[in-house]
């Protein structure tokens, strides 16, 4: 039998292939083992963001316990504005003239989060929103009071906008400008306005972001879409009337 020569060209190639195979197995195994931990962290981050916009996140908050105690997730059929028992993630194309958020499509249902008090009464409803800014899709949450119109708080938690400019959408000082503003006008049309420079002191206007007009336009488009009849409009109208 011929003796294996690891220093030959064939031997070198074989050693490289074996090492590559071993490394691939290690990497694949690590990915499988880490996936549950990654999914757990993803869920924890989601719960933190929800508690944060609800005003329930403090430095020493037990996220899982607080979320389980005060947050009730519900699925909403966006077309009817009614609660549904099951999620329907099938995508619906958004006509170009209606796609103010520039997201092209959305699922038929979405998850909303009811914020309860100690007696189990709903004090806020948290709605997920997303839309395209200058460089990225911007993901946020809006907390709305039970009247279906008054903003309790907002947060943007994921985006790729320019740090120090469009990235200021995640600045708590800017987010605080939304508190107490009204989502709709008297005709129940989306009424939030991102104003370049200093906004007038009214129920609907928000100061724009300095040096980030296009990101501000993206936020404007996001609110225009998600609080229209094609987004959360029907749901919030039912919430306001007490139908939900």
UniProtKB/Swiss-Prot annotation:
Pfam entry (one): FMN_bind
GO molecular function: FMN binding; oxidoreductase activity, acting on NAD(P)H, quinone or similar compound as acceptor
Keyword Flavoprotein: yes
Compartment(s) where it occurs, according to its Swiss-Prot or TrEMBL record: Cell inner membrane
GO cellular component terms attached to this protein's record: plasma membrane
Ranges that cross the membrane: 13-33
Residues the record lists as FMN phosphoryl threonine modifications: 213
SMART domains linked to this entry: FMN_bind (SM00900)
Membrane topology category: Single-pass membrane protein
Main localization, broad class: membrane
Annotated EC: 7.2.1.1
GO BP term (any one): sodium ion transport
UniProtKB keywords: Cell inner membrane, Cell membrane, Flavoprotein, FMN, Ion transport, Membrane, NAD, Phosphoprotein, Sodium, Sodium transport, Translocase, Transmembrane, Transmembrane helix, Transport, Ubiquinone
Top-level EC class: translocase
Family statement: Belongs to the NqrC family.
General function of this protein: NQR complex catalyzes the reduction of ubiquinone-1 to ubiquinol by two successive reactions, coupled with the transport of Na(+) ions from the cytoplasm to the periplasm. NqrA to NqrE are probably involved in the second step, the conversion of ubisemiquinone to ubiquinol.
HAMAP family: NqrC
Assembly and interaction partners: Composed of six subunits; NqrA, NqrB, NqrC, NqrD, NqrE and NqrF.
Name recorded for this polypeptide: Na(+)-translocating NADH-quinone reductase subunit C
Species for this entry: Haemophilus influenzae (strain ATCC 51907 / DSM 11121 / KW20 / Rd)
Lineage: Bacteria, Pseudomonadati, Pseudomonadota, Gammaproteobacteria, Pasteurellales
């Amino acid at each position: 039998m011929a003796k294996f020569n690891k220093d030959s060209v064939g031997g070198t190639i074989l050693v490289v292939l074996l090492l590559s195979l071993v490394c691939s197995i290690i990497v694949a195994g690590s990915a499988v083992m880490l996936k549950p931990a990654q999914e757990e962290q993803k869920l924890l981050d989601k719960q933190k963001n929800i508690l944060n916009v609800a005003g329930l996140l403090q430095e020493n908050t037990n996220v899982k316990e607080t979320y389980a105690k005060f947050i009730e997730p519900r699925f909403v059929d966006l077309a009817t504005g009614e609660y549904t028992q099951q999620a329907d993630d099938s995508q619906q194309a958004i006509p170009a003239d209606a796609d103010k958020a520039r997201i092209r499509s959305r699922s038929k249902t979405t998850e909303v989060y009811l914020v309860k008090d100690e007696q189990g009464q709903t004090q806020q409803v948290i709605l997920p929103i997303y839309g395209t800014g200058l460089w990225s899709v911007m993901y946020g949450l809006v907390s709305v009071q039970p009247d279906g119109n008054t903003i309790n708080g907002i947060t943007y938690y994921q985006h790729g906008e320019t740090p120090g400019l469009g990235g200021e959408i995640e600045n708590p000082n800017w987010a605080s400008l939304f508190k107490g503003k009204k989502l709709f006008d008297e005709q129940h049309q989306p009424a939030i306005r991102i104003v370049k420079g200093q906004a007038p002191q009214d129920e609907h206007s928000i100061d724009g972001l300095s040096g980030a007009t296009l990101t501000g336009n993206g936020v404007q488009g996001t609110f225009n879409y998600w609080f229209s009849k094609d987004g959360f409009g029907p749901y919030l109208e039912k919430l306001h009337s007490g139908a939900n």
